C-alpha cells in the first residue's frame, strides 16, 4: 500500500497551525459573532472579516493585529509566497494542510494578501509599487473578473472593455461579487481589449488604483447573512489607466 503519511515538515506545520487555532482563534469566536458590522458600513475595514461560511462578524483591530503578528512570527503569513520574495514557497499539499486547520475556526489566521497572478508577470516597477507591498501586508487588492452576465464563462461573455487612447487605456464596464473591492488599495481588472481574440489573447489585466476618477462601488447583500457583506459591484465609467499599469 502507498504511504499516505504526511512528510515530517507538514506534520509539524499542521501541529503549529492547530495550536494557534485552538489557543488563539477559537476563543475569539463568541466575541466575533456577537459583533456584526454596522448597517452603514460599506467599505469593509480591516476589522471586518468574511468567512467562506458566509458568517460575518467583527473584532477589535488590536486582536486582528495580534493574530497577524503570530502568523508572521511563525512564517504562516507568507507560507505560499515564492522564496525569492522572502516566503516559504510551500506547494499544493501544504496549502491543503493549512486550509484544513485554519478552517476549524470561523476566526481565521491572517495570511499575506499576495496577488499571485502578478508573480512572474508584472514589471519591475509594478513589483516594487504593488506586489512587494501586498506581500508585506501594506496594500490590499481586489481581483475583478466576474460580471453580471459573465460568471461561468468570463472569456466568452465579458462585457468590460478597454480602449487605447494615447498612452492610456479607458475602461468601461461593471464587475460583480468582488470581495473587499471598496477597501482595496488597488484593483486587478480584466477587460476585453480585442473582441475577436478574447480569451485567446484579447483579454488584458489592468492595475486600477483606488480611488480613481470614474471608479465607484455598490455593496451587495448576500442572502445567507442578514448583515452587509464585503461583496461589491465595481463600476468603471471611463476609468483611465496608463500603459505602465497593464
Where are the language model's segments positioned?
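A short, Trp-centered hydrophobic/proline-enriched beta-strand micro-motif
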Residues: 137-146, 190
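Amphipathic, small/basic residue-rich leader segments at the start of a protein or domain
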Residues: 1-110, 129, 133
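Structural signature of FAD isoalloxazine-binding scaffolds in flavoprotein oxidoreductases
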Residues: 89-101, 154-157, 235, 241
Amino acid at each position: 500500500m502507498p504511504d499516505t503519511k504526511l512528510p515530517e515538515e507538514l506534520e509539524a506545520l499542521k501541529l503549529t497551525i492547530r495550536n494557534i487555532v485552538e489557543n488563539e482563534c477559537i476563543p475569539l469566536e463568541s466575541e466575533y459573532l456577537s459583533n456584526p458590522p454596522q448597517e452603514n458600513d460599506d467599505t469593509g475595514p480591516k476589522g471586518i472579516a468574511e468567512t467562506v461560511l458566509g458568517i460575518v462578524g467583527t473584532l477589535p483591530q488590536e486582536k486582528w493585529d495580534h493574530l497577524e503578528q503570530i502568523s508572521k512570527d511563525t512564517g504562516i503569513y507568507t507560507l505560499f509566497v515564492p522564496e525569492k520574495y522572502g516566503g516559504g514557497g510551500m506547494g499544493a499539499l501544504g496549502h491543503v494542510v493549512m486550509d484544513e486547520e485554519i478552517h476549524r475556526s470561523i476566526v481565521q489566521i491572517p495570511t499575506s494578501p499576495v496577488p499571485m497572478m502578478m508573480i512572474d508577470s508584472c514589471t519591475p516597477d509594478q513589483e516594487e509599487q504593488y506586489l512587494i507591498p501586498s506581500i508585506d501586508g501594506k496594500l490590499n487588492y481586489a481581483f475583478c473578473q466576474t460580471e453580471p452576465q459573465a460568471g461561468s464563462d468570463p472569456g466568452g461573455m465579458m462585457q468590460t472593455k478597454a480602449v487605447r487612447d494615447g498612452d492610456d487605456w479607458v475602461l468601461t464596464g461593471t464587475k460583480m461579487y468582488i470581495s473587499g473591492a471598496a477597501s482595496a488599495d488597488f484593483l486587478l481588472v480584466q477587460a476585453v481589449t480585442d473582441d475577436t481574440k478574447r480569451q485567446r489573447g484579447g483579454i488584458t489585466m489592468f492595475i486600477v488604483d483606488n480611488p480613481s476618477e470614474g471608479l465607484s462601488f455598490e455593496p451587495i447583500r448576500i442572502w445567507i447573512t442578514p448583515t452587509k457583506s464585503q461583496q461589491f459591484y465595481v463600476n468603471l465609467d471611463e476609468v483611465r489607466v496608463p500603459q505602465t499599469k497593464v
